[in-house]
Amino acid sequence: MPPHGHHHHHHGHHGHHEHITITPVYAPPQVVQPIYAPPPVVQPVYVQPPVVYPQATIVLETGHHHGHHHHHGHHGHHDHHHHGHHGHH
């Protein structure tokens, strides 16, 4: 029983703790970043060149999409999984 509990705790703590620690600290910036996204959308008018337009859009979209999607998906999935697993156990 002790080894099983320890193993389960370690596994859960490792994944949960890492995500929880990074999620709350990175959550505010990510939530505030979307508001920063509009500027680039309006910038294209100033940056007419198609070479800079796609580059800026891709870079911003990648960072915004990646961060938002990663956090939302990971956090929700992990949290749900952990909760379900815990209850099942």
Swiss-Prot record:
<feature type="compositionally biased region" description="Basic residues">
    <location>
        <begin position="65"/>
        <end position="89"/>
    </location>
</feature>
<feature type="region of interest" description="Disordered">
    <location>
        <begin position="1"/>
        <end position="25"/>
    </location>
</feature>
<feature type="region of interest" description="Disordered">
    <location>
        <begin position="60"/>
        <end position="89"/>
    </location>
</feature>
<feature type="compositionally biased region" description="Basic residues">
    <location>
        <begin position="1"/>
        <end position="17"/>
    </location>
</feature>
<protein>
    <recommendedName>
        <fullName>Uncharacterized protein DDB_G0272718</fullName>
    </recommendedName>
</protein>
<dbReference type="GO" id="GO:0006950">
    <property type="term" value="P:response to stress"/>
</dbReference>
